[in-house]
Amino acid sequence: MDIAIVGGGIGGLALALTLHQRGLPCRVYEAVPAVKELGVGITLLPHAMRELTALGLGESLVRQGIENRDSRFFNRFGQLIYDEPRGRFAGYPFAEVGIHRGRLHLTLWNAAMTRLGGERVLTDHQFVGLDQTDRRVTLHFRSSAMGAPRAPVEADIAIACDGVNSLVRRLFYPHDELRFVGINTWRGVTRARPCLTGRSYVRAGSIQTGNIVIYPIIDDVDGEGHQLINWTTQVAQPGYERNDWNKRGRLEDFIHIYASWKFDWLDVPDLIRRSDVIFEYPMVDKDPVDRWTFGRVTLLGDAAHPMYPRGSNGAAQAIIDARVLADRLAEGVDAPAALRAYEAARSGVTARVVLANRQHPPDYIIRRVEELVGDTPFDDLGRYISRDELGRLSDEYKRVAGFARKDVG
């Protein structure tokens, strides 16, 4: 069986490595002319680390990032609402890791280049179309750098791993649109002294009044004890519908929301102001679709189930997709049947995560407290909600997203 993977991002590379591990030949076709270390931070939850450890990459990723020790939720006045241990500190068999997205991507890329060989991991291949029969699929590409057509590529099956704006998906869903909800985000990374434990994943404030997520991704980045700290602000802005993923953000558009957020554990406006770079883009997803598989073509990761980046789950779900699909293909059944079996196993699961990220994401804890207490500091949170109830809210998201402790073995 010859498998073509359209897209060399996290999902596509995880699939290539997993297929190679199962003895199934594949080729990766990535659009960019050259792969570089780009992006900001990403969190690898224990179920993602389970899959990456099975690929032999777990220890390397822990070394390159920072293993999260705890998660803490604060209101916008800096008061602690709830905290809990994370990853191995919570009894999971695998770590939870904050890491630079570019480091994660290059780790996967270099592993694929080493294991599959450079002739099977190709750049500068922009997808433009496909044809298929009941026996084969033919893919058409052009050079991203030069614009010239490339020779057609034939394969037994094709897997679309080309992201939230998937061109492959658009062939089957030509009227498919991103779902904008009027939430804008600004993201950056800042060199700073460690915050709290130095391994804490922090969420503060609600989207209605201004939310920020903060976690470290590189330790001792300068030899002087500073960390590279990733931060993401999320603010409700009705009517915001610009699909621009690489737009540079402007500090003056949002810093006023956080001007008073100077806590004894962190000066938030100072952290934001000292960022090396700020990116701005809207929070979007797409409604779950009934079908991913069309003959000898299927969708994976964000091409199949784009979701809000609110639960550190987008990459994790793509990586799990890769393992499930590789396992089905390795069973040796008819290839289109294997694609359908993969879809049956994953579509319902991921649809529930998409909806959970909309309705009850991890920071729902903060919103719930704001609903009970109001937009004001509290004297005794226990008068409004118990710690056990807060824990149940946190555990419910873990259950839906597939990383409850009992499910990660």
Give short role names for the model-derived ranges:
Residues D244-V277, A335-P336, E343-A344:
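Flavin-binding catalytic cores
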Residues V121, F180, T197-S200, F263-Y281:
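A short coil-to-beta-strand element that immediately follows conserved catalytic motifs
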Residues F74, S200-E241, Y258-S260, M283:
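Active-site substrate-recognition segment that forms the wall
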Residues D2, P25, L228:
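Residues at the starts of beta-strands that form the adenosine-phosphate
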Residues P33-E51:
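Conserved N-terminal glycine-rich FAD pyrophosphate-binding loop of Rossmann-like flavoproteins
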Residues M1, R63, G78, G311, ...:
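C-terminal helical "tail/cap" subdomain of flavin- and related membrane-associated enzymes
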Residues G8-G23, R27-V32, I159-A160, W186, ...:
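Conserved mid-domain beta->alpha element of the FAD-binding
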Residues M1-I3, H20, H47-V189, P238-E241, ...:
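Conserved N-terminal helical subregion
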